[in-house]
Amino acid sequence: MTKQIIINADDYGLNERNSKAIAQAFEKGLITNTTVLANGDYLDEALALAREKNFFDKLGVHLNLTEGEPLTEDIKSCPRFVSGGVFNKVYNKRRTSPLKKAEKAAIAKELDAQISKLEAAGVKLTHADSHHHIHTGVFIAPIAARVCKAHGINKMRLHRNLGSINAVKRIVKKRYNRWLRRQGFVTTEYFAYVMDIRDSVIPDNTEIMVHPDFDKDGVLIDRRGMEGGFPIGYPLPDFRNDDIKLKGYAEL
């Protein structure tokens, strides 16, 4: 049986280099979708590039509370999320800490603004995921789900459920994935990083996350980090073969 998988490139619009790498990955047929940072430094140019390269209909939203400048004012008064006018990663390191009422309202307003900005630019969003997986946090998840539903987004990324995961985290992830589907969201059956399936059989209906970028030699890679100011990683893989067909989120 031919297996169908989704390859989603995160961080579109983050900067010029990674956005052009994602465009090249589309041209090579290596990815099926990308999710956009509405507060990315290269957003306008990235959207124009998506139109030019004919993948404007394959864009989702990459919800963000951890990097760059917020689009709204209220969240700037929430020090667990913003300091010095830019998002920090304070709350992301303490996801089990309850949110205050004002924080919940500010988060909802910010996520709504991010989606609205992309919609105003003409993007018909196919799905949602998030920067540093903030949409899976126990207290942020209901807010993200509610905002996405209000915008008619009914497809969302799972919590990672393939690869090496300890017993406690596996339970947490399984509960989230069940909850997400109970909220009415359409999902894949599995979600993995490239390293989770590099030497394994890829199950049918899996989403694989990649971060296309160019290394210092201009090679298209799946970015795993930075070194000396340049992205480092492995060559962006081609998962296509006789047993695997790529599909987009629109086909899910």
Protein language model regions, located:
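DG-centered beta-turn motif at the end of beta-strands
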Residues: A9-G13
